Regions:
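Amphipathic, interaction-prone secondary-structure segments
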Residues: 11-54
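Mixed-charge, Lys/Arg-enriched low-complexity segments
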Residues: 52-106
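Acidic, low-complexity intrinsically disordered regions
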Residues: 3-4, 11, 40, 53, ...
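Weak global preference for isoleucine
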Residues: 3-4, 29, 33-34, 84
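Negatively charged, low-complexity tracts enriched in Asp/Glu with abundant Ser/Thr
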Residues: 1-27, 57-60, 94, 98-106
């Protein structure tokens, strides 16, 4: 997982690496990278969430993508950073809109 870990470190993310996963974060966003295993059909998995609304991955994932190779995942991060952040912002906006409806429209 060194290719991905180095990419995050080179781009200013705080990185925590475990046996089969890597978490990278800034003050606003959290990334989870999972090594291939049976649960991911042998693919690398990337999940991304806003830190402010993070509860657990099952409830908070704004982006979830799968890749055949570690290099493919790294290239996706490199080439799609703006789109990843846009998707996280869109997801966060939808969450706040739902909270507003629950609190003020019911």
């Amino acid at each position: 997982m060194n290719i991905i870990k180095n990419w995050f470190k080179d781009n200013g993310y705080e990185v925590d690496e475990y046996e089969t996963t890597l978490q990278a974060k800034t003050d606003t966003i959290l990334f989870l990278v999972v090594k291939p295993h049976n649960g991911t059909n042998g693919k690398w998995m990337l999940r991304v969430a806003a830190l402010v609304s993070f509860d657990r991955w099952a409830n908070s994932t704004a982006v979830e993508e799968f890749f055949n190779t570690e290099t493919g995942l790294r290239n996706y991060l490199e080439n799609n950073q703006l789109y990843i952040y846009k998707d996280v912002l869109r997801s966060l906006s939808e969450e706040y809109e739902e909270m507003y409806r629950v609190n003020y429209e019911d």
